[in-house]
Amino acid sequence: KYQNWEVTDPECWIPHGYACVRFDSRGAGCSEGFMSPNSPKEIEDLYECIEWAGTQEWSNGKVGMLGISYYSRNQWRIAAKHPPHLTAIIPWEGGNDPYRDSGYHGGIMSQFLERWSKHQVMNIQYGRGENGRKNPNTGESATGPHTLSEEELAKNRVNAFDELKKHPFDDEWHQERRADFSEVKIP
């Protein structure tokens, strides 16, 4: 009932003594701000969220991450930054190389980011309000209380596909969006 696509099922984990927390990235869901998926800023924000969770009174100080696809990719990147409270990750079915995995297959631009942006990212952007998805448990907007115009929404997000087109080679833009596996020190 409370599971969110691509992340853990709290009804499975909570009875075993785990607290489950899912964060909305900046500009997504009910979090205001400029939406920039897969950006270094998003990883900084998630690092702070991990440290927040590790210091709550209900927390034992050990934070783990679990998830598929996008959440998998983020786990590797965050683990390589060594947040003190992160003790384990369980990533699966997620790539680490944005250039080869989702950007340019064999040097040929993939349409993945264009489709993903339209069907996944834009649908969960903060500010969709009345026009956005509803939380199936509460009936409230899952994209914040405000309803912004399409122009305002566009000003509050990066166009990932347009950004990809600016980087046809495996340059710094792609490199700062992948984890350095040699820096991942946790199980």
What is each PLM-predicted segment?
Residues 1-54, 103, 110:
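Cap/lid segment of the alpha/beta-hydrolase catalytic domain
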Residues 3-9, 15, 77-184:
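Accessory cap/linker subdomain of secreted extracellular hydrolases
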Residues 19-20, 61-64, 85-90, 187:
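Beta-sheet entry/capping signal
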Residues 25, 183-187:
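Short, conserved helix/loop micro-motifs enriched in His/Cys and acidic residues
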Residues 31, 67-72, 93:
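Catalytic nucleophile serine of serine hydrolases
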Residues 55-57, 182-183:
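Glycine-rich helix-loop-beta junction characteristic of Rossmann-like nucleotide cofactor-binding loops
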Residues 57-70:
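Alpha/beta-hydrolase fold nucleophile elbow
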